[in-house]
Each structure stands twice: as C-alpha cells, then as structure tokens.
UniProtKB/Swiss-Prot annotation:
Residues 460-484 form a coiled coil. NCBIfam families: thiol_BshC. This is Putative cysteine ligase BshC. HAMAP family: BshC (MF_01867). Belongs to the BshC family. It comes from Bacillus anthracis.
C-alpha cells in the first residue's frame, strides 16, 4: 500500500474551519492545537462522571461482543479519573454501512493513540452506535456493481417492525441470502470463502441490526482496543436518566441557545442546517413502537400534534420507570455524549462538523464546553487496474477529485476528433433551418394551405439531422470503446454516483479483494490531520 495526500476543495463551514478562519473558529470552544487539548484535559478534571457505573455496563456489553483483551483493559481504564476518550459515532449500517464508518473508527484509534503519547494521559477509543435510530431506510442497504451499473441492494426483512435499530430483529436466513446476493456481484477470490465465514460468524451471534453491526465491527477491530457503546441500550439509558431530566427542565434554554447560535452562524454568512420547531423539547419518546418527538404545548409535553400528552411530573415518572423509551434528537445527542463520556475529542464528518458549529451556546446552557471537534480522516482506495486506467488515459491520480469524470471523458473524446461534433452540427442545423425558413415563406406565398405541412417538414429534417448526430457520436464512442470503458471504471471506483468512494462502497468488497487483514494494513499507515484527502494505492 502506498499513501498519498491531495488537497480536495472543501466548502462552507468545513473549509473555513480547516483553513483557520477566526470567525467560524469562534463557534467552537477549542482550536485544534496541542495547547487546546491540554486545556481540555484540565477542564475535564474539574467535572465528575459516573465512571464506575459506566465501566460496569461497558464491560458487560463489550464482553458479549467478544471484545479482545485490549478493549477490556481500556474499559477498565475508564474507571480512572485520569482517563479520557476520543469518540465518534454512526448508525448501525448492514455490513457496517459505507466505508466512511470504517474511516471514522480508524480516525478514532489513531487520534486516541497520538493524544495519549503527546499528553501523557490515558486516552481510549470509543465508537457510539446510534441504536435509537428508527429509519431503517438509512441502514438496510448497500451498493454493488451489476450489469455495468451501480445498484442499490436493499435488505427486505420479512418481518419488518417499527422499532429502533437496537430492537429491530434480523431475520438471519433472509439476511444470509441478501449477503450471498451481494457477494455474487464481487469477483470470486482466494479470500471470498473466509470473508463470508467471517461475516456469518457475526450474523449467527446477532438478533438485531445493532448486534450484527457490533459483532462485525468488534471482530474487524478485535486487537485495536476499540470500545463500542450502543446508545439505546436499556442499561445505558438507566445511567442517563438524570441528564434526561435536566434536558426536560431546561428545554427552553436549550432551544434559545440553538436559536442564538444559529443567528451567529447566519451573521457569519453560513446557512444553518438544524431545523427545529420553536417549541421543541429535543427528546424522543417511544409510544406504540413509534419514536415520537416531544413538543411543548402550554406547559404540557405533547407528541404527534397533541395525540399524546404528558405533564412534567408524568414525564419524569415515566423516565424513571422506563428510561429505554427515551432518546435524543440531533441537538441533545452531543450533549448526552458529553454527559456520559470524559470526551477529549469528538471526531466527525463534514456534515457533523457543520451542525456542531450550531451547538456551542446549547452546550453552554447546560454548563458544558463543547469538546474539540476533529474532522475525520478521509480516504480513497485506488486498485491496480484503476491506476493502470488512469495512466493509460494520461490522467493524474488527483484528476477525478478535482473534475467531474464525465467532463474528463468528454474532453478526452473531443480531443480524439479533429473538429468538435456538437459545434459542427449546431452550425449545420442553423444553416439548414435558415434555408428552410426562406423556403417556407416561398411555399406560403404560392399555397398558404401547405404552411403547416412545411412546418412539419422542418421538424422532420431537424429530426433526421439529430439522428445523424447521434449515430455519428455512437460510432465514435464505439471506435474508442476501450478507452471509454476505462473512464467508466474510474468513475465507478473513485466517484460512484458522482459521490466520494467512501460514501458509497462497502468495506466487504475490499476484504474480498485483499483479505481479512485489509483494515489492519490500512491502520498501519500514517495519516495526517491537515484536512488533506488520503489516496491509498493498493
């Protein structure tokens, strides 16, 4: 594996944050400097955490996932007041979801190791599985290449229920068949059998989406020391009850903090992305197997436009009685994370970084400081055949990241032709239509009744010219079919669906191609935190 860094253009909040623009940096409590991380350690030392209760829960949860010894030791270390965490999170995508989930975990592992060495304190890596998520459409699919097209392959569970990812039971047999269908689209390699067995070992131990995700991630990172947490685990929810109560008692201040911070964001020229109602309580409650967002209505806490209604006392009593019924929304999830974990740093993608910039004053209303927000490592993998295609087309490895691949293809094709086809046909159509318009005037003078027919005649002639243009283009493309297929392969591999590779493709393709130690070998590579994109040649 060979690693190379390229500067990929960023936009908006992310670009300005990474470029050190002071205005947007003022929306965060810590800059990404070593002094800021030292200050963060000092700030965390002044706070209290329910460490022992958390350790008890995490030991039980990670042991069930058959965690390695390094993970168990890291969990136990959390009981020490001088241990801190680097954390990131994601939904429980089937087969771990898009590659960026793996890249987030690699980011967490690397930053935790680096900060432990530089700060001289124990820093452990934590990955937060968003088990409360009810949106199965976000996690029930993966993308594959089939018949020279990119296909979204959806897992259709025979017994779908309106439940969270932590509670949604998987039909193991259906899931196994779905996985087999995915692997039929991959080339069979020396690793295929082992990878399928690896996945099936995790599937057999799983009852829910979160189980499957957790087992697969733990198995993939078994020697890394990674700690997993299911955000919707009933035992964790019990530990969170005091903070849920605090949110309910301060929801107006939370909403005001969000509103004020979004006003700051607007004044800086950015567009806020968090949308909430002015009466939002920022907590979900599970009612009749549905996740209902609570709102304030004249002192009552209501859901679904008043279908459900609770007094403050009733809501608090229900939190104490059934904490597993409650979960956070996009505003309070970061707050709950801050309450539970002594967070040295949060690692997020571009979208997360943008919405965290809207939360600074929300953190302050609770008496927290927002942790350092570190953009995750971004990676694209270039296989040998794709590297060869780039070379054959005289393209740089960075070209697909700076230019639309379709545009690169069009430019290349136009360079193979002496005279541009589009321009010549535009000229020809104009000349022919001008002549025909004159002819129509002549016909109209002699026989006005033929005017409509003359107009149709113009349309037919134009149709035939366009047909000739299409046939010429098709023949030119056929002549250069080999090269154009290279462009298609490059696009599918590096910019599938016009998106970054890591947002579409799944890690299982790479495990199948390069073996079960693929992720371990990627983790051995040195990654920088300078905001540049990492290209790994395989």
């Amino acid at each position: 594996m060979e690693i190379k860094e390229i500067s990929v253009p960023q936009q908006g909040v992310v670009a300005d944050y990474m470029n050190g623009k002071k205005e947007i940096q003022s929306c965060f409590d810590y800059m990404l400097t070593e002094d800021a991380f030292k200050q963060r350690v000092q700030d965390l030392r002044e706070r209290e955490f329910f460490r022992q209760d958390l350790v008890t829960h995490l030991l039980e949860y990670n042991t069930k996932l058959q965690a390695g010894e390094a993970t168990i030791q890291n969990v136990k270390a959390l009981g020490d007041e001088n241990t801190y965490v680097v954390i990131a999170g994601q939904q429980a995508g089937l087969l771990t979801g898009p590659l960026y989930t793996i890249h987030k975990i690699i980011s967490v592992l690397q930053l935790a190791k680096e900060k432990e060495e530089s700060l001289g304190v124990k820093v452990v890596p934590v990955f937060w599985i968003a088990g409360e998520d009810h949106d199965m459409d976000e996690i029930n699919h993966t993308f594959v290449t089939k018949n020279k097209k990119i296909k979204k392959t959806i897992f259709h569970d025979r017994n779908p229920k309106k439940a969270s990812a932590s509670e949604s039971e998987l039909s193991l047999e259906d899931c196994r068949k779905w996985i087999e269908e995915i692997f039929k689209t991959y080339p069979e390699t020396n690793f295929t059998k082992d990878v399928l067995q690896f996945i099936d070992d995790s599937l057999r131990k799983s009852n829910t989406y979160v189980d499957f995700f957790g087992h697969l991630i733990m198995k993939m990172f078994v020697n890394s020391g990674l700690i997993l947490v299911d955000s919707h685990h009933p035992e964790l929810r019990k530990l969170e009850v005091p903070f849920f109560k605090q949110i309910v008692s301060k929801y107006k201040e939370v909403q005001e903090g969000l509103h004020n911070q979004q006003r700051v964001i607007k004044e800086l020229g950015y567009k806020p992305i968090i949308e909430t109602k002015s009466n939002a309580v920022h907590i979900f409650m599970e009612i009749d197997n549905e996740r209902v967002l609570l709102e304030d209505n004249q002192g009552k806490f209501v859901g679904k436009d008043g279908t459900y209604s609770f007094s403050y006392k009733e809501l608090i009593e229900e939190m104490e009685r059934s904490p597993e019924r409650f979960s956070n929304n996009v505003v309070t999830r970061p707050l709950m994370q801050e309450y539970v974990f002594p967070t040295l740093a949060f690692i997020g993608g571009p979208g997360e970084l943008a919405y965290w910039s809207e939360l600074q004053q929300v953190f302050h209303t609770i008496g927290f400081r927002m942790p350092p927000v570190v953009p995750r490592i971004t990676i694209t993998y270039i296989e040998r055949d794709i590297a060869t295609d780039l070379h054959d087309l005289q393209l740089q490895e960075s070209d697909p990241f700076f230019n639309n691949v379709d545009k690169l293809r069009e430019n290349w094709l136009s360079n193979q032709i002496e005279e541009p086809i589009d321009e010549r046909f535009v000229e020809a159509k104009k000349e022919i239509i001008d002549i025909h318009k004159s002819l129509q005037q002549f016909v109209k003078k002699i026989d006005p009744g033929l005017s409509a027919f003359a107009g149709k005649n113009e349309f037919k002639i134009n149709e035939q010219i366009e047909l000739l243009e299409r046939m010429l283009k098709r023949n030119v493309e056929k002549k250069h079919e080999v090269e154009l297929n290279k462009f298609r392969r490059i696009q599918f591999a590096l910019r599938p669906l016009g998106a970054p590779q890591e947002r579409v493709w799944n890690v299982c393709y790479y495990l199948n191609q390069f073996g079960l130690d693929f992720v371990d070998r990627v983790m051995e590579k040195p990654f920088s935190w300078n905001g540049k994109h990492h290209v790994i040649k395989l």
